[in-house]
A protein has these predicted regions:
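Helix-terminus/linker motif at the lipid-water interface of multi-pass membrane proteins
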Residues: 23-42, 111-118, 174-181, 242-269, ...
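Short runs within selected transmembrane alpha-helices of multi-pass transporters and secretion channels
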Residues: 62, 131-149, 157-168, 186-201, ...
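Transmembrane helical elements of multi-pass membrane transporters/channels
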Residues: 9-28, 130, 141, 164, ...
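Hydrophobic transmembrane alpha-helices of multi-pass small-molecule transporters
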Residues: 53-56, 100, 168-172, 197-202, ...
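Small-residue-rich hydrophobic transmembrane alpha-helices
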Residues: 41-101, 138-157, 263-321, 325, ...
């Protein structure tokens, strides 16, 4: 078996798919920023955590079911593997309906809690209400992707994302620039793009006879519990950057105002693509890790994990270099004001310090939930926003205000990576079959 070619067969399409999912937000920011300006950028930045929550629900349920599908398929338990798919499908639909009702009904109140007021609240509400109405398209679009990858066809998941991405760009141009629909146009384009992604994924599953809806009632409770146990980790992995975004926006509103929020909006659009690329390495290698774990093939598991760490760190460094070289152009891409663009150039190097550490944490987390060590992945995922909150409460009042908001995010990610290394060593000593070698 050629582990290297197998690794890249799964990982490269996954990276592209995850990168495109991050560019969805950038596309909206680009069109809205150039049409409305800083107020539009700030509105999308504040509303985005809600959209990210919707997508994270799909990712968590889909990945939770996909992990158990791969493990059971590797153990030759075909019927049980199919029931995990069916259970996940019904969970995706049910969660979609609940999400639409709650978010649409309480959108203004939720956005107010996230720090929106005035024109920003108005713009963000227009955006998020339409996103809520299309929640089922986003949840199905993100939830089906892990299954397509675990069926052994990462290319098709990439194709589905590309189809949705192109749809989003075309409709953003038409709705926001030609018909001047503003925030509502951007939101409509986003859910239409996700609808195309979901449709392509469902067509693939139906054509390949991988679309299962039957599950024995006696197994529902057990399977839902298993899916949620594993799914909480990728759910958290998708959501915690946006919990961090909420903290940054709230503290920045106090220390730096709208200018600081707009500044980080532009930075986060770009750097989150790098984060998603790193997650693409982890989730792209997950089907292989789960498969080799189910087959009890520890040597192959070690090789895949080693390649994932090395490749993720290389991508983090390369992404950081590209972002640093082009830092002066970031604000202009999103139609930011001159003052905001200057500030972006100043703070980008701060955030780039954390990229290699994020790479380590992302792969460690994926390795844990791919091999049924969800508890350890929970620790890594949720410690980051906790540390960030602590640093933001302590450092800015003592050492320099807004600049320490930026450094608090870096310190939280560095300490999270150190904890990841400790947990890996703990697994090695405890003989928990994590199987990672030194990198």
């Amino acid at each position: 078996m050629n582990h290297k070619s197998l690794f890249f067969k799964y990982v490269i399409p996954s990276i592209i798919a995850f990168a495109l999912s991050g560019i969805y937000a950038i596309v909206d920011g680009y069109f809205v920023g150039n049409a409305i300006g800083d107020a539009g950028l700030s509105a999308i930045n504040i509303a985005y955590p809600i959209e990210a929550l919707i997508q994270a629900l799909g990712t968590g349920i889909g990945m939770g079911g996909a992990v158990y599908y791969s493990i059971n398929a590797a153990e030759k338990k075909g019927k049980r593997a199919e029931e995990f798919i069916a259970t996940s499908w019904w969970l995706l639909v049910i969660v979609s309906v609940i999400s639409t009702i709650i978010i649409y009904s309480f959108s203004s109140k939720i956005l107010g809690l996230l720090g929106a007021d005035g024109i920003i609240l108005t713009n963000a509400t227009d955006y998020i209400k339409i996103i809520a109405l299309g929640a089922i398209l986003q949840i199905l679009g993100t939830g089906m992707m892990p299954f397509i990858r675990n069926y052994g066809n990462s290319f098709w998941s990439m194709f589905a994302m590309v189809g949705g991405f192109i749809t989003n760009i075309v409709l953003d141009f038409i709705f926001v620039w030609i018909y001047e629909m503003g925030m509502k146009g951007a939101a409509t384009a986003t859910i239409a793009g996700q609808g195309v992604t979901a449709a392509i994924a469902i067509i693939y599953a139906l054509y390949n006879k991988k679309f299962y809806v039957y599950v024995s009632l006696k197994n529902v409770k057990e399977m839902c519990g298993a899916i949620f146990r594993v799914g909480l980790a990728p759910f958290g992995l998708a959501l915690t950057p946006n919990i961090s975004l909420v903290f940054i926006n709230r503290f920045s509103a106090s220390y730096g105002g709208e200018k600081a929020i707009a500044t980080y909006a532009c930075v986060s659009y770009i750097i989150c693509i790098i984060y998603l690329i790193l997650q693409g390495v982890g989730d792209g290698s997950q089907p292989l890790m789960s498969r080799f774990y189910g087959e009890k093939d520890q040597e192959s598991l070690r090789r895949v994990q080693r390649m994932a760490y090395i490749f993720a760190i290389i991508l983090a460094v390369c992404g950081g270099i590209i972002m640093y070289v082009n830092r002066a152009n970031i604000g202009g891409v999103f139609g930011a004001s001159y003052e905001v663009s200057i500030e972006i150039s100043k703070i980008v190097p701060i955030f780039l310090v954390s990229l290699p550490f994020v790479a380590i944490t992302r792969i460690a987390t994926a390795g844990f939930y791919a091999t049924e060590k969800s508890g350890l992945s929970y620790i890594l995922i949720f410690i980051e926003p906790v540390l960030m909150l602590i640093f933001m409460l302590v450092l800015p009042p003592l050492f320099g205000g807004q600049i320490m908001i930026w450094w608090s995010t870096v310190l939280a990610r560095v300490f999270s990576a150190i904890l990841a290394f400790i947990l890996i060593k703990y697994c090695e000593k405890g003989d928990l079959q994590y199987g990672i070698q030194k990198i």
